[in-house]
Amino acid sequence: MRPFISKVYGAILAMVLAGPVLAGTLQDMIDAAADGAEVVPPAGTYVENIVIDHNIVLDGRNGVVIDGGGVDTVVTLKTSGATLKNLTLQNSGRLFTETHAGLYVEGNYNVIRDVRIQNTLFGINIKQSNNNVFRRITIFTGAQPLEMRGDSIRVWYSNDNKFEDNDIQDARDFVIWYSANNIIRNNRIRNGRYGIHFMYAHSNTVEKNEITDCVVGIFMMYANNIVLRDNQILRSWGASGIGVGFKESSGAKVYNNNIVGNAFGIYLDPSPWDPDHPNTFEGNRIAYNGVGIRFLNDWTGNNFSDNSFLSNFTQVLVNGRGTAMREGWNGNHWDDYAGFDKDKDGVGDVPYEIYNYADRLWMEVPHASFFRGGFALAALDFVERLAPFSEPRLLMRETAPLMEPPERLKVQDAPKSALEMLQ
């Protein structure tokens, strides 16, 4: 075991057990601790790769940094009922094949809180671990190009965990594989690839998170019964930028989210896969996106109600020659609705309809989207609307659109306006 480097003067190491114990390394302190003991090392930087295999409390409140020295995973936790808190973990190895991380967890009912993980390949790697709590963890894996980063948090066959109040920046993905009933709440995730990515992971809840400047905000791939509510999903730009995406996923409940400033606000690639379990989108603000909702094909089983579609360059896009006529549209607000409300009941008296005129050029030939927003395509669209060369295709229809956004989604009543979210 390599010796540690400490900023503390003196040679006596204190540990809170039944009484003070002298030890040569942090690993020695941990190994000497009885089950349930609290280990409080002196302040300093300990250059070691630590293994915790019994249920202690490791508290770095004095100012403890554990440095992996660029080798392997910094801390390996293979036990149940342990607590790690008030620590800094840094400088893991850099081998993707070994998944070198700041912290590896394999166990149940552990609590990891108030920990900073920096300059590591992966942040936290969690395997076959249930009922753990990860709270107030800061993960900054380093200013690497995106393709050289590891995942901030990787969850593998792990259920009933809580991830709360964490701050993640400049990592690759927060990815959940084959895991159920996890709660991801009140986290800040910035400048990654997938903010949160579910793979074959069912019945998880994502709420009150702020996900900004990622390539993709939240993506569900073969993941059913996911709940997304009260999240801010902002500024997923680039050619493949997606706010919320689905791939063959069913039974999602997407409520009260702000999906603002993305290339594609919502992306649906045949979802729901199970026709008996529709996806529900209710009370969302879908604003200032390049495309509000993109359907990869003509599909059915998605129900949209009480949403506000505001200043999207294109409200709805269906690739190829399909339509969104089989989807459910009920009581949404569309800011480009040109109808009227003669009886003043708040509901438009004529349907909201989207027809494809010149737009179908870039919808059917994606490379033509280069000209979208330009004078030539705008002029062609105007002429098509004035005197169509051929019958335009009806893309979608809502029979009872709202004249104004639902009360909760009125910009003046929101904590932040949609424009402020873009800044």
Please report, for each region that a protein language model flagged, where it lies by residue.
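Bacterial N-terminal signal peptides that target proteins for export
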Residues: 1-12
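Acidic Gly/Asp/Thr-rich repetitive segments characteristic of extracellular carbohydrate-active
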Residues: 21-51
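Extracellular beta-strand-rich, repetitive "passenger/adhesive" scaffolds
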Residues: 41, 60-65, 87, 115
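Extracellular beta-strand-rich solenoid/capping regions of secreted or surface-exposed proteins
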Residues: 46-57, 66-110, 121-129, 155
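Extracellular beta-strand/beta-solenoid scaffold signature
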Residues: 68-76, 96-104, 119-125, 141, ...
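Functionally critical loop-and-helix segments that line ligand-binding/catalytic clefts
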Residues: 237-239, 243, 252, 265-274, ...
